[in-house]
Amino acid sequence: MKSDIEICQTATLIRMKTIASNLGLHDDDITPQGRYKAKVNIDALKHLEDKPSGKLILVTAITPTPLGEGKTVTTIGLAQGLAKLGESVSACIRQPSMGPVFGVKGGAAGGGYSQVAPMEELNLHLTGDIHAITAAHNLASAAIDARIYHEQRLGYNIFSEKNDLPALRIDPTQVVWKRVMDHNDRALRMVTIGKNEDNKTINGYEREDGFDITAASELMAILALATDLQDLRQRIGRIVVAYNLDGLPITTEDLQVAGAMTVTMKFAINPTLMQTLEGVPTFVHSGPFANIAHGNSSIIADNIALKLTDYTVLVATLRGIKANSGLFPLSSGQSLPKALFVPNQEALIAGLDNLHWHIKNCAKYGLPVVVAINRFPEDTQEELDFLADWVTSQSSELNLDVAISEAFGKGGEGTRELAQKVLIACAQETEFTPLYTPDMSLLDKLTAVAIKGYGAERLELSEKAQQQLAMFEQLGYQHLSVCMAKTPASISTDGNIKGAPTDFIVPIRELRLCAGAGFVYALCGNVMTMPGLPEKPAFMNLDIDSNGNITGLS
């Protein structure tokens, strides 16, 4: 079989104006970015608002191996399968970060015959949204250190009188807004800035700082959650970047930088329209880090897609289930054990607890579940049939169906059965049931996620986390939602614990406030917001020929 990039480069694509026109978008709704991608003006929603909304299908996955189990492949393949059945359909996916593209995971355009194209443009820069977020984020960082420098250089009173601005009195030890870049670079996790020679302060005042990957920026989460340009502006203005000497929050609005940050992101609020290899429209927008934010593409892209064209598809793989048996050592950045790719009934049976946990977890929210068994070339029909039969055996107690997906090898033709079963699920009446309500305290919300969501015995907050929790409540942030930042390699907070653990403790070492995005996230265990490169990074495979053709991207 050809490589992903070879398949993509030999595909016949449709001009973007045709894709947009077939969707019902007007010429002035899009701004072409070359032949095969275009920005969709957010104002398109105004002439679409009276149209009925379509069905929203959420694709998630079991506890993954480091290479992922195929959420994007399944999303794209399912969209192509629905199109094969004559349905009006579009896909919505996140924009890939270049960090993982150059690291261990590679690109995020799907794979095989279920890809978004051109995949090299999607994986590398696209329309520059991530760079705009990086620039806006680091503008706030520069504003913080400039304000500290000038206020301390002149003194608070003189600074205020000279510039007709209030002295913010930022505590340099309480700056919570790190800098960002769109690469994996562990050496930048902790840095010292403002270093000078001979006791001078020309380079600013020295303090400890660090870098996160841009996908971990609160701005990325805000872009994904904002509903329009005004909402984006208001959310950016609420971002807390530091605390003053009295312990009170300093926002980007206080720094008077929120407007400039929004201006920098003005173009980024518009989703990018692309297509799958089979010409299915695909909206690509935002890319929040999934383990410290909600990890979905944008609400704006979803709203536009729903007007143009409420159920869960759970992706499982044989290797993913075997990996959750606990019989094989797994390590991020390392190759998967070869034993995961050969028939092993013992490992398959031992790993079923993890799939069962995820099925029940989806069912908690009141949604019907369709399990998509994502087929890999090395999978045997015997093991695939065994897994499908096992899922079917669980359907008597749960609203559940199953289909083997061959999206990778066959595109939309390989997901016809999955698409038919998803359509049946979409015809059902459902009522979404959240784990907690907005009026609950932050502690009760965190406890609900840990106990009701993960099946933990209890929470265990560090002294620092307890102090932060009390401060956030005192400052009036108790109404915010919560997010758990933990390893994706386990249901628990320990990546070495596989399967479906119970009665474990969820340790919270630190809480971080995202007032603009609208949530508080808890750092559980050793979660990194700036990834590092593996021993053999994916960038070693990338090259370009004299004709500009890229090779080695997957």
UniProtKB/Swiss-Prot annotation:
It comes from the Bacteria. One of its GO terms (molecular function) is formate-tetrahydrofolate ligase activity. One of its GO terms (biological process) is tetrahydrofolate interconversion. InterPro entries: Formate_THF_ligase, Formate_THF_ligase_CS, P-loop_NTPase. It is an enzyme of class 6 (ligase). The keyword Cell membrane does not apply. ATP binds at residues 65-72. It catalyses: (6S)-5,6,7,8-tetrahydrofolate + formate + ATP = (6R)-10-formyltetrahydrofolate + ADP + phosphate. Pfam families: FTHFS (PF01268). Pathway: One-carbon metabolism; tetrahydrofolate interconversion. Its EC number is 6.3.4.3. Belongs to the formate--tetrahydrofolate ligase family. Keywords: ATP-binding, Ligase, Nucleotide-binding, One-carbon metabolism. It comes from Aliivibrio salmonicida (strain LFI1238) (Vibrio salmonicida (strain LFI1238)). The keyword Protein biosynthesis does not apply. This is Formate--tetrahydrofolate ligase.
